[in-house]
Amino acid sequence: EEKDFSFIYIGDVQDSLGGITRQFLRKTLAHNPDASFLVCGGDLIEQPNHAYWNEAFQSMDSIRQTLPILTVTGNHDYLKGIIAELERRFSLTHSYYLDSMEGVNQVFTIRYTDMQLFCLDSNREFFHLYTQRNWLERKLEASKAKWKVVVLHHPLYSIRGKGNNL
């Protein structure tokens, strides 16, 4: 079913302790009161630890009660180590990840009216990106949505040619 709608996209927030995300989101919503949902392109937090998660939760709580928030993973949402591991609070906070993992990849798709969002995790090791690409090709082929939007943390194309992610 087609109907007009709008959504808000924010990316690479990396809010610091005592940061301005809460005020920014309130102003953004005040200027876009009819937005159907909010999409975040990752990095809700600066560091994956309790203090930063607490700040992010406080910033999002009042919004989350009235507006759905979809978030893809950013590199700051991962614990640093030999193999990057997604901070547990991320998938507990954004529970749609728990039902939509493709192997070890954090991917999901959501349809809203005649638009379908395909959300990828561009932070994974290189070999995982191939399985995500295969997942995306299958989902795009099966989608009947008029509008198809792919969301990931890193740009597909960069003005620095060597930074292209396709």
Model-based region annotation:
Residues 16-20, 126-129, 158-159:
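Short, solvent-exposed loop/turn elements at domain surfaces
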Residues 29-47:
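Active-site metal-binding motif and surrounding structural segment of the metallo-beta-lactamase
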Residues 15, 45-46, 77, 156:
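Short active-site segment of divalent metal-dependent hydrolases/proteases
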Residues 154-164:
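Active-site clefts of carbohydrate-active enzymes
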Residues 14-18, 46-49, 124:
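Short, flexible loop segments at the rims of nucleotide/cofactor-binding pockets, characterized by
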Residues 1-14, 26, 30-34, 148:
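Acidic, histidine-bearing metal-coordination/catalytic regions of metal-dependent phosphoesterases
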Residues 9-11, 37-43, 68-75, 120-121, ...:
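Active-site neighborhood of phospho(di)ester-bond hydrolases with catalytic His/Asp-centered motifs
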Residues 1, 50-148, 162-166:
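Extended active-site neighborhood of metal-dependent phosphoesterases/phosphodiesterases
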